[in-house]
Amino acid sequence: MTSETTHWNDVGIDYDKVLGTDASNVALLSAAVDQLPSGARDILDIGSGTGRLTSLCRTALPEARIVGVDPAPAMVEEAESKFADDPLTSFRHGVAEDLSGLPDASFDVAISSFALHHLELGTYPKAAAELLRVLRPGGVFINADQFCRVMGPAGSKERATDVLALLTDKAKYYLREASFERMLLQIDLLPRFLREDGEILTTPEFWRDHLLDAGFAEADIVATEPVELFNRVIVARKAPGAAS
């Protein structure tokens, strides 16, 4: 989740409105929120964007403190405006692989939606370690994102074929079930996914394995409908007795 992801500053759409037409995205976010522990007091929203997921977390846990982190200044500004009257919610500029501005063991939950596929593959170990660090013992990391079926070098025929087929099917689904604008957004971003330019799909197992390697006690993969679109929620837990 580097500065490359700030291309979202330049996407000329009403992000909340367009994503709101997509039932598959709504289902993914709902599945993520369903994983929130009822007693969570402090929540970190990674790649918080305009605050769509933040809003759902606030509804689910009205007394929790929520901190949103995003690399795109325009997104941070929009989210701050949206939550200007909420003293328990704040936003800051930052990236998943460097949460050095946040203290150790300061959150019960780290949650993310449609954001961490912006990470460069080489930064996954650092991001996983940072997520583990900021969570309290027993804390949970919830990652709702889009994934692919094939790993491999960027530009390899097998990987590119999988990504092209998957995202083309998604575009057709969006046109049929969501909106023309949602389909166009997918098509506009397709070259970035194929070049792995700020939009880099992985298999869910790739993420799970890095979380376990970082020291998470367990990590589960939850499929959401329609399963063929390969949206998944990864739920990883820090051991209750783990060092902070």
Residue ranges, per PLM feature:
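Conserved class I S-adenosyl-L-methionine
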Residues: 1-37, 52-56
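C-terminal alpha-helical "lid/dimerization" subdomain adjacent to the S-adenosyl-L-methionine
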Residues: 144-212
